[in-house]
């Protein structure tokens, strides 16, 4: 039995004594303890060494007091497992070779045996669950098909997604073939993470806002739905969070994927999101990450505002406090600790 199951209760919209909190990228460069480990190893080796991945996954639980851990990994492990060469230099960027731009390139990508090619993530989950010893739930995750598609076609990050969109608009069938191939791997991968012990899954569509509403409906949402339903078919009680960054105009359709929670960027008032969605899903978010550069008073004021805007809980509501995107690497860890403690204290009155 979990000693602290608030995060899972909120996702399932069950009564909670307060609002649970975790933050995206909570295991990362803002923590000196993380940097000490990173000094001795490169990023992908850290992801691929279960003992180290476990250690950095648990750091924010012990140091910051967050209500959930998220397994330390990277969304691009899926691209690598499919046969792409992935180079991640934390300060300089990402390079994937060769970029996928033709039918022959797509054919060359493999549908990997997840237990084999991504076994190190599953081992890290098993080890982390053991060491966490039921203190808090563990989140598994994957990038969404559209986001992984953009990295594959662009060969890295991009400002305007020209190659990805060129394929979408000139060769839509080819684009769907690649998206479908990536999505099949994601579905298998997230189910394997649950099997290994993950208590919840988050799908990150980091580059969602690059698409128009109609294009998002065609090239992104169907695959997210496929991934959510894959988990639900096998593990109906495992909550799934969908974080389609800044897709504030189609929140209702994101909720229609069957997910348990919708992650929000900071560009929308959480009150407005709750008005749109009612209490049919849990909401996760959505403080601007740069608020953590502020004074203690400002951090508390902004956190209080998010809690106030979400408002009073009902028997069907759920809210997980988070940032609207990942914590920034140069934030003072003391500021996150302050935020976590404040949310724990301040949120009780809304429950």
Swiss-Prot record:
NCBIfam families: hemE. The gene is hemE. This is Uroporphyrinogen decarboxylase. Pathway: Porphyrin-containing compound metabolism; protoporphyrin-IX biosynthesis; coproporphyrinogen-III from 5-aminolevulinate: step 4/4. InterPro entries: UROD/MetE-like_sf, Uroporphyrinogen_deCO2ase_HemE, Uroporphyrinogen_deCOase. GO terms for cellular component: cytosol. Keywords: Cytoplasm, Decarboxylase, Lyase, Porphyrin biosynthesis. HAMAP family: URO_D (MF_00218). Homodimer. Its main location: cytoplasm. It is an enzyme of class 4 (lyase). Belongs to the uroporphyrinogen decarboxylase family. The lineage of its organism: Bacteria, Pseudomonadati, Chlorobiota, Chlorobiia, Chlorobiales.
């Amino acid at each position: 039995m979990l000693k602290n199951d608030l995060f899972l209760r909120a996702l399932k919209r069950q009564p909670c004594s307060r609002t649970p909190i975790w933050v995206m990228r909570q295991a990362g460069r803002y923590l000196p303890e993380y940097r000490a480990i990173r000094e001795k190893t490169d990023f992908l080796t850290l992801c691929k060494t279960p003992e180290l991945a476990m250690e950095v996954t648990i750091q924010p639980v012990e140091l910051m007091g967050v209500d959930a851990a998220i397994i330390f990994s990277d969304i691009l492990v899926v691209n690598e497992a499919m046969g792409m060469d992935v180079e991640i230099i934390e300060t300089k960027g990402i390079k994937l070779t060769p970029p996928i731009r033709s039918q022959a390139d797509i054919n060359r990508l493999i549908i990997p045996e997840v237990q084999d090619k991504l076994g190190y993530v599953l081992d890290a989950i098993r080890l982390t669950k053991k060491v966490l010893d039921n203190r808090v739930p563990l989140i598994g995750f994957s990038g969404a098909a559209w986001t992984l598609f953009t990295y594959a076609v662009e060969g890295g990050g991009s400002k305007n997604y020209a190659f990805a969109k060129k394929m979408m608009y000139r060769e839509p069938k080819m684009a769907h073939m690649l998206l479908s191939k990536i999505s099949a791997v994601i579905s298998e991968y997230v189910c394997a993470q649950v099997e290994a012990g993950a208590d919840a899954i988050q799908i990150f569509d980091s580059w969602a806002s690059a698409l128009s509403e109609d294009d998002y409906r065609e090239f992104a949402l169907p695959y997210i739905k496929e991934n959510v339903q894959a988990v639900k078919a096998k593990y109906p009680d495992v909550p799934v969070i969908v974080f389609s960054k800044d897709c504030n105009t189609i929140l209702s359709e994101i909720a229609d994927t069957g997910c348990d929670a919708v992650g929000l960027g900071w560009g929308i008032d959480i009150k407005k999101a709750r008005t749109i969605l009612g209490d049919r899903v849990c909401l996760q978010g959505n403080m601007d990450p740069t608020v953590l550069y502020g004074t203690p008073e400002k951090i508390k004021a902004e956190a209080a505002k998010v809690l106030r805007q979400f408002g009073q809980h009902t028997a069907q509501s759920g809210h997980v406090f988070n940032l609207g995107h990942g914590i920034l690497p140069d934030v003072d860890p003391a500021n996150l600790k302050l935020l976590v403690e404040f949310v724990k204290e301040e949120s009780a009155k809304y429950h």
